[in-house]
């Protein structure tokens, strides 16, 4: 019997009278890597928000781990243990890798923290994926790839059964992407599910078991691996979405450089 980790059925979601998701249908199976290919950005933020937070729906049903967690007739506004990893890291830059993974997580209640003990707890996870990231390294010193891996480990340790990766391939090298894909497949074999959001159809077909094309807040087509490439028009639109992703990343880098320059200017001149 195929088990489902997520089902969004006929979901219509509004904000301020504006429909952001319209008759939205998606199903992700346990241990599946599901590819989501957005033609444009419309409705994406609403979709990601609804994954983690059971906001009031105009219509439809949301099931997580085969339990009804949200429906249009009533909503409890509770959270779901679903991790979302974006190109902009959510890790605390001024804390170490091990602190981000173990200390900054829901359910951690140990008041006296022994760094050595936490590092020993982390090591089996690093050994399993075959990646060497010094546990005591500050996140600010990590590469983008290492931050992605750290966020995946944090999600696994926290017990997330569904991990979403949004546009991560745009910002790492080809060899790093292959390593990330290997880690995703490893955890998928362990029963963890993934939604892999990418603007590249070829990448999705390489990694994912099934894929869906998202347009204007709707899923318009679902593909199996090996199915023909969709029409040219949607693919051209996906390229436009990819350019938008890259422009957002450049804007983030510019904002970071601006903040660092302001910090540098505000520092008092040291006496020689």
Where are these regions (language model features)?
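Conserved beta-strand
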Residues: 8-11, 19-29, 60
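The feature captures the beta-strand-to-loop junction immediately N-terminal to the Walker
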Residues: 37-40
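Conserved ABC transporter NBD signature motif
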Residues: 57-71, 75-78
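Q-loop/switch helix immediately C-terminal to the Walker
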Residues: 88, 93-109
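H-loop/switch region of ABC-family ATPase nucleotide-binding domains
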Residues: 198-199
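A short, surface-exposed alpha-helical micro-motif characterized by mixed small hydrophobic
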Residues: 204-206
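C-terminal boundary and immediately downstream tail of ABC-type ATPase nucleotide-binding domains
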Residues: 216, 221-259
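Single conserved hydrophobic/aromatic residue that forms the stacking wall/gate
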Residues: 263-272
């Amino acid at each position: 019997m195929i088990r489902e980790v997520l089902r969004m059925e006929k979901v219509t979601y509004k904000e301020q009278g504006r429909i952001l998701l319209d008759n939205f249908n998606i199903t992700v199976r346990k241990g599946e890597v599901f590819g989501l290919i957005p033609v444009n950005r419309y409705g994406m933020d609403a979709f990601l928000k609804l994954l983690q937070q059971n906001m009031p729906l105009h219509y439809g049903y949301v099931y997580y781990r085969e339990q009804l967690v949200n429906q249009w007739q009533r909503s409890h506004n509770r959270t779901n243990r679903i991790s979302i990893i974006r190109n902009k890291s959510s890790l605390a830059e001024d804390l170490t890798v091990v602190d981000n993974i173990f200390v900054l997580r829901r359910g951690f209640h140990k008041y006296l923290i022994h760094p050595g003990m936490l590092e020993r707890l982390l090591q089996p996870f690093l050994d399993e994926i075959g990646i060497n990231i010094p546990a005591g390294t500050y996140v600010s010193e990590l590469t983008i790839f290492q931050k992605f891996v750290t966020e995946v480990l944090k999600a696994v340790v926290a017990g997330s059964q569904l991990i979403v990766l949004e546009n991560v391939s745009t910002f790492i090298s080809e060899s790093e992407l292959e390593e990330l894909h290997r880690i995703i497949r490893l955890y998928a074999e362990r029963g963890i599910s993934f939604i892999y959001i990418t603007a590249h159809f070829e990448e999705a077909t390489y990694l994912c078991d099934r894929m869906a094309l998202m347009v204007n807040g709707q899923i318009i087509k679902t593909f199996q691996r090996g199915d023909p490439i969709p029409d040219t028009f949607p693919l051209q639109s996906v390229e436009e979405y990819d350019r938008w992703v890259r422009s957002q990343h450049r804007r983030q880098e510019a904002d970071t450089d601006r903040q660092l320059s302001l910090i540098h200017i505000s520092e008092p001149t040291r006496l020689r």
